[in-house]
């Protein structure tokens, strides 16, 4: 039959997929501490409702930042809005390429007009102090070796066969592969968001059923797990480990319920087995305050945690909040009612399809 020879044109994803794509797109901005504007959230709602297409969302957001109101927004809010739209667009596509060129294409697609170096490999070496490493840095790839290292990693992955592997073995391999790509850190900024988009698309390409909520809810954990997968200090008995990244992927691909806590990854704490390093690693005031910042987050009140979660994921549901916060849906409802009565939050739109806003 002739119609079998026709290619189907990729259309807008269904409502459920839209929500998941937007949750991941907005949640991944939290990796760099970015939050979307209220205008962006309202425009996203219209897309989810089917009122406008994702291309129209992109056009409206671009136009918003030429208005008087948009020009008052901070550059970080502009970045959060525009990159979130672009991530959602990429996640709605079924196209994929396993190679360094496609990785650069993702970066350029996300950050064109935001970073001058969008889609271009860095020509300088970098380091970054990490909270979970107490101020130490991962050793990122030497700039002249970025392209050959990426080519090697992608060639090895292309040759690799997942046939006859158990899910545990697949998760271990995927964790190491993704960690290796991230360690190269080929771009000046935006590496984790680029890696996350690439990873989601690759897993779908392999045939895995991927729900993006785990990336949305645990974007900082994802980055810190990548950090721990690429840091070692033999003097203090610290070895690079994909253990934490495997927990993330086991939740994603095997529907496990591993607890994903950033504090577990801090080197030299009682949360992990490297307690012997606690006395050996020098603790500058900066490192101490950084660790206290992570530990303080675990002592937040329930309402503070709910507000933080809503700020990161405005389209979250009561059920999702209950799961993240660790209390019953009824308990979440009571807390939300208290916050609404106190004038701290409001719900915009219908019960099932609306979003939360924080009243500053």
Model regions and ranges:
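FIC/Doc superfamily catalytic core
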Residues: 1-360
